[in-house]
């Protein structure tokens, strides 16, 4: 059942319903970055299942961000950020990312979002 598979892929259903596209870019990337942090922590603790789940949530949030019409001019950077995270977790780490560099990149957005409140 394709509909069931689609529903299973939607981990953040309330966000898909429209709330995500009302959030600022800083909030969106801060939230996506939280999933990166969770994936990094799970990897450090040897929990492949939690790592994979957090990575899937990150990908869903990044895909929602990339699809946000307000951010059309930022798609290249957003796609690159998504690519770098995927490269680290499931690729050859061609970008030579470290857990610290990934955390630092996304933490900057979370801090900016908090300052903006």
Give each language-model segment a name.
Residues 1-117:
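Surface-exposed peri-terminal alpha-helical interaction modules
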């Amino acid at each position: 059942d394709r509909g069931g598979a689609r529903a299973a892929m939607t981990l953040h259903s309330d966000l898909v319903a429209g709330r995500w596209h009302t959030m600022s870019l800083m909030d969106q990337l801060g939230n996506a970055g939280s999933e990166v942090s969770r994936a990094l922590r799970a990897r450090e603790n040897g929990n492949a299942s939690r790592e994979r789940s957090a990575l899937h949530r990150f990908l869903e949030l990044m895909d929602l961000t990339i699809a946000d019409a307000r951010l059309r001019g930022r798609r290249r950077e957003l796609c690159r950020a998504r690519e770098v995270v995927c490269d680290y977790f499931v690729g050859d780490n061609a970008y030579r990312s470290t857990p610290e560099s990934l955390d630092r990149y996304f933490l900057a957005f979370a801090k900016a979002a908090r300052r903006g409140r």
